[in-house]
């Protein structure tokens, strides 16, 4: 037996049904040692659930029930034991319930027993993922160093790992180690070919996968250590890149998989690999078949660390706020962590375009080599030097994802989120917030001796009120406005008032238990009561508040470590701890939504309703107290967790920022005293000036220190909305800068008039008018500009725009069909520019500029539309454009009429000189 320490990269679980012997459940842990050895740990685990038995049963009756039930449902009788746990559903004074832990050899047996027993008995925790269960039982993190003790060589190897061992799950344990794991990261990309000069389709026999480029880099190292491009057909050398030429396409894919194996790849990354590259590779393997034997020439089973079973197709159809509607196509790589950077950016960043070129330019100041698809096709048909140009292009495409991975700390973001909630990294990629919050609750409930019941939900009718928004006193405030914000309001409310499913009073008999204090709140769903903890002893604290306490402490500690790492110049640890603290924050904020869901693991809508109702009361109380503490002050707005106060100060102190900061801090501190800890009303910023348009819509200069310059802060205006063109945002931003920084409205109006004139005179480049929308799968209404442009691109190039991609477009003038639907005037910006087309200036004035500009100046001018768009010069130019439109329309109608009557235009009888 031996002890080893590994850093896990993948967790797999399965019911194993051997040819001989009994079935069992196994968890396979893949990882790497500090010395760079690959490891596979086989560990058996017996899944279980809890079942509540009647309180009246004697020990003998319970034992008989255990024996009979174990025999009937193939449970492991020696491991099925009586236990006592508290029920995490409804306040009952912390009563211990009689329960039985039924243990099974396989998940299939567990599910069968649960299905048969659930109508007769209350089942607990049958839906807990066994892998997650092990994380909590052994207090280990899914993406952190773990100790594997008492391990012995595996009797039957299932992987190609350097080391393969077996051990009991009880011999897994945590290791306090933040050493950088020597993970090998492989960034890869494919290049494809179409003989017909159309978009390559894997099912077309001659649409080859012509090159696969891969760049290898060790995690934490500054530079890659190997760049290799496997090429179909002879390819000339490329400086700094290893070129491997193959005679057959199948050899390209087999060689690439062997390289991944030889390099002991731990993390596979790419850009759009889940929607294109992996699907294409799979499609080409179906075409690579031996004509004589009919056998596959490419063995996808060589992907990953298993001896067999790699390369299986995994299709996922996901619809979420983060991803939208998307279909993902993966080839399974057991033992290897897969990351598609495109999906990470879609989920975590709000961008105009998610192309690798745009993202790299934005975050790295770097770009791809420009090599259009048609040139790739031509160069593939050329000589070895031509194909080397493709290889250099492909290698560059694999460098950029590695740089983005490091720059954006993407690996740290995924692994630290996985560690914070104790779920595998794969769950972070493909599953929602529910599983994360549930895993956290499972762990905390176990610590506090609670069991989470299956199939519990609060039956509610109607909807509860959302967060409070105080009436907005619209206007332009050229005096300082103090912003008072509650720190982590919803998690703090839950902690302060002990809100949890097992502290919520659900039965009348527990409404007035002697010695128990209650918090009562009226909501849109009714009145709810929560048993409160003893502040001196902590007794009676709920599971959810206790969990949030822990997360708050963990976050505070992570921020402390992050600051230390920053002082020490340790960039790796700084990024690691920053990812940690952000993960804890996300989890804390997700618990409210987890409990408020109508469906899920343990939905408890009353808690969500109680939290928002309490938040409303706190916002209203803050507004009231601010005016009481500083008579003459005015609350001009209040949102979910913040209140804006125009403080009444002596005339000579109104514009004194030091005094404003001093009084705002005092005000926040005084009001905080009215609330139960840990609720904390903070003061962090002054807005000056502050233009309030309506609820959730404002523009201001934000000061976080009294002596700083301040930064523009905008919410809800067209300036920050992606459905407006750059010209709209640019004009609004430039106008706002003049209003906010110079406090000069007349000059802002003059500058805006000049910018509108330039639009009407077509003096701005076309990219300023470009918009983009995400292409989805299937539309009820097909009159969509981006769909129309996507269809045009396909007709012209043969290249379909993939679902999920953002399609750029501009609206152009169409003199031949001026009255067609606006969506049909949408055009591909590149095509429009190359063909000298002119943007539809009337459309941009009427639909992109008129309303946003008038809205911007509404609090500042009596009649913005009249003063700006009714200005003589602007009005005249707009009328001229409208007259041209009418003339074009008249001509177009005459031409259509003549065509319908089979008549020629008189102009057709004359020739141009």
Swiss-Prot record:
The keyword 4Fe-4S does not apply. GO terms for biological process: base-excision repair, gap-filling; DNA replication proofreading; nucleotide-excision repair, DNA gap filling; viral DNA genome replication. It comes from the Viruses. PROSITE patterns: DNA_POLYMERASE_B (PS00116). InterPro entries: DNA-dir_DNA_pol_B, DNA-dir_DNA_pol_B_CS, DNA-dir_DNA_pol_B_exonuc, DNA-dir_DNA_pol_B_multi_dom, DNA/RNA_pol_sf, DNA_pol_B_thumb, DNA_pol_palm_dom_sf, DNA_pol_type-B. GO terms for molecular function: 3'-5'-DNA exonuclease activity; DNA binding; DNA-directed DNA polymerase activity; nucleotide binding. It holds the Pfam family DNA_pol_B. Keywords: DNA replication, DNA-binding, DNA-directed DNA polymerase, Early protein, Exonuclease, Hydrolase, Multifunctional enzyme, Nuclease, Nucleotidyltransferase, Transferase, Viral DNA replication. Signal peptide: none annotated. Disulfide bonds: none annotated. Induction: Expressed in the early phase of the viral replicative cycle. It catalyses: DNA(n) + a 2'-deoxyribonucleoside 5'-triphosphate = DNA(n+1) + diphosphate. Its EC number is 2.7.7.7. Residues 182-401 are annotated as: Contains conserved residues essential for 3' -> 5' exonuclease activities. It is an enzyme of class 2 (transferase). Belongs to the DNA polymerase type-B family. In addition to polymerase activity, this DNA polymerase potentially exhibits 3' to 5' exonuclease activity. This is DNA polymerase. It comes from Paramecium bursaria Chlorella virus 1 (PBCV-1). The gene is DPO.
């Amino acid at each position: 037996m031996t002890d080893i320490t590994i850093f896990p990269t993948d967790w797999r679980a399965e019911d194993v049904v051997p040819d001989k012997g009994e079935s069992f459940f196994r968890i396979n842990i893949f990882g790497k040692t500090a010395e760079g050895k690959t490891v596979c740990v086989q560990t058996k685990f017996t899944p279980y659930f809890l079942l509540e038995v009647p309180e009246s049963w004697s020990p003998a009756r319970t034992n008989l029930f255990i024996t009979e039930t174990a025999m009937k449902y193939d449970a492991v009788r020696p491991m099925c034991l009586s236990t006592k746990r508290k029920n995490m559903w409804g306040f009952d004074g912390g009563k211990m319930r009689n329960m039985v832990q039924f243990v099974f050899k396989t998940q299939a047996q567990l599910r069968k027993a649960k299905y048969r027993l659930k109508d007769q008995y209350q089942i607990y925790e049958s839906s807990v993922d066994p892998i997650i269960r092990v994380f909590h039982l052994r207090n280990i993190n899914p993406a952190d160093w773990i100790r594997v003790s008492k391990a012995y060589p595996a009797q039957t190897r299932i992987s190609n790992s350097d080391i393969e061992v077996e051990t009991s799950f009880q011999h897994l344990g945590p290791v306090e180690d933040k050493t950088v794991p020597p993970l090998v990261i492989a960034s890869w990309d494919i290049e494809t070919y179409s003989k017909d000069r159309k978009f390559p389709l894997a099912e077309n026999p001659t649409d080859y996968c012509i090159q696969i480029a891969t760049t290898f880099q060790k995690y934490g190292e500054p530079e890659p250590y190997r760049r290799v491009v496997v090429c179909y057909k002879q390819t000339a050398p490329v400086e700094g890149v290893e070129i491997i030429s193959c005679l057959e396409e199948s050899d390209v894919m087999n060689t690439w998989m062997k390289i991944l194996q030889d390099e002991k790849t731990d993390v596979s990354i790419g850009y759009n690999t889940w929607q294109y590259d992996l699907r294409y590779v799979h499609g080409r393997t179906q075409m690579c078949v031996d004509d004589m034997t009919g056998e596959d020439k490419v063995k996808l089973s060589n992907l990953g660390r298993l001896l067999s079973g790699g390369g299986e197709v995994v299709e996922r159809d996901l619809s979420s706020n983060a991803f939208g509607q998307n279909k993902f196509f993966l080839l399974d790589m057991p033992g290897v962590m897969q990351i598609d950077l495109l999906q990470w950016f879609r989920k975590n960043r709000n961008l105009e375009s998610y192309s690798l070129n745009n993202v790299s330019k934005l975050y790295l100041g770097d770009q791809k080599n420009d090599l259009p698809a048609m040139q790739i096709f031509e160069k593939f048909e050329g000589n070895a030097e031509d194909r080397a140009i493709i290889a250099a292009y492909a290698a560059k495409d694999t460098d950029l994802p590695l740089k983005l991975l490091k720059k954006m700390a993407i690996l740290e973001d995924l692994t630290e989120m996985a560690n914070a909630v104790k779920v595998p990294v794969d769950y972070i990629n493909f599953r929602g917030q529910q599983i994360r919050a549930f895993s956290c609750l499972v762990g905390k409930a176990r610590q506090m001796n609670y069991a989470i019941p299956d199939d519990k939900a609060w039956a509610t009718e109607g909807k509860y009120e959302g967060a409070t928004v105080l009436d907005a006193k619209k206007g332009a405030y050229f005096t300082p406005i103090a912003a008072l914000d509650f720190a982590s309001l919803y998690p703090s409310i839950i902690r302060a008032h002990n809100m949890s499913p097992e502290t919520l009073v659900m039965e009348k008999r527990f409404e007035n238990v002697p010695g128990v204090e209650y918090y009562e709140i009226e909501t849109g769903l009714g009145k709810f009561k929560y048993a409160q903890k003893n502040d001196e002893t902590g007794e009676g604290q709920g599971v959810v508040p206790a969990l949030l306490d822990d997360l708050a402490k963990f976050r505070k500690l992570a921020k402390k470590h992050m600051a230390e790492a920053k002082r020490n110049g340790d960039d790796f640890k700084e990024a690691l701890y920053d990812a940690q603290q952000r993960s804890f924050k996300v989890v804390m904020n997700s618990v409210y939504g987890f409990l408020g869901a109508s469906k899920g693991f343990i939905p408890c809508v009353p808690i969500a309703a109680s939290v928002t109702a309490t938040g409303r009361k706190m916002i209203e109380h803050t507004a009231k107290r601010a005016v009481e503490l500083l008579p003459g002050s005015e609350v001009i707005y209040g949102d979910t967790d913040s209140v804006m106060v125009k403080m009444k100060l002596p005339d000579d102190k109104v514009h004194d920022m030091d005094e404003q900061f001093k009084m705002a801090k005092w005000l926040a501190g005084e009001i905080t005293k009215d609330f139960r800890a840990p609720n904390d009303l903070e003061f962090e910023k002054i807005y000056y000036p502050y233009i309030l348009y309506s609820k959730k819509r404002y523009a201001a200069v934000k000061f976080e220190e009294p002596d700083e310059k301040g930064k523009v802060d905008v919410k809800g205006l067209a300036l920050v909305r992606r459905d407006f063109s750059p010209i709209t945002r640019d004009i609004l931003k430039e106008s706002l800068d003049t209003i906010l920084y110079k406090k000069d409205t007349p000059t802002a109006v003059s500058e805006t008039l000049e910018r509108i004139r330039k639009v009407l005179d077509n003096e701005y480049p076309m990219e300023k008018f470009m918009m983009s929308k995400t292409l989805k799968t299937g539309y009820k209404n097909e009159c969509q500009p981006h769909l129309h442009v996507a269809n045009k691109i396909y007709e012209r190039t043969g290249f379909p725009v993939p679902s999920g991609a953002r399609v750029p477009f501009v609206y152009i003038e169409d003199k031949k069909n001026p009255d067609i639907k606006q969506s049909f005037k949408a055009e591909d910006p590149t095509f429009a520019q190359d063909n000298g087309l002119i943007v539809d200036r009337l459309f941009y004035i009427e639909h992109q500029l008129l309303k946003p500009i008038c809205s911007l100046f509404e609090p500042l001018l009596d009649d913005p539309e009249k003063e700006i768009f009714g200005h003589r010069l602007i009005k005249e130019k707009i009328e001229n454009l409208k007259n041209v439109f009418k003339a074009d329309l008249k001509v177009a109608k005459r031409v259509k009429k003549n065509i319908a009557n089979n008549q020629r235009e008189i102009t057709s009888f004359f020739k141009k000189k």
